Amino acid sequence: MAAAAAARAAPVELSESDFAVAINNHSFALGERWSEQTRTQAGTQISESFVGDVPAGETSYKYYQHRYAGFDIYTANLSWQKQQRDIDSYIIAQITINVPAIRTARGIAIGDTQNVLIDTYGQGTTDDSDGQHWRSYETKNKRLSFQLEHGRIIHIMMTLDTDS
């Protein structure tokens, strides 16, 4: 019994593949370039809207929300100067999942229990602010977060830090 509890508490090392999801038989990953082709591969877009400029140090980055049935993809012109890209070139900065049909790289989906999440990813860190319960896992400049309600996952979010 103690060995099982210790195994559940052990942190799990995340890899780049943990920050990608398969949607419509195509992979979408944080930091990937956003193009007309990736927009089309995601399916029928419900809406696109400018979210705003997000300050980061001496500069700010533009964010757009691309809404699809069951998920959203946020794009930003993050690090365009550092990577010597055009100011109007965008990368995937956030992916939010709201339906059980889209699973994480390790198979976790909306509706799964907190116990299944912990068995798969470890304890992670918790945040109970604003009346919400989140469990998150981070590596370098990326975060994978799960919102839980009544012990079940109701929302999955992958984010890329603005400093990346």
Locate predicted features.
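N-terminal low-complexity, Pro/Thr/Ser-rich intrinsically disordered segments
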Residues: 2-35
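A cross-family detector of function-defining hotspots
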Residues: 9, 34-84, 108-152, 158-164
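Second-shell loop/turn segments in exported
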Residues: 23-28, 100-108
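A short, hydrophobic secondary-structure junction motif
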Residues: 70-73, 98-102
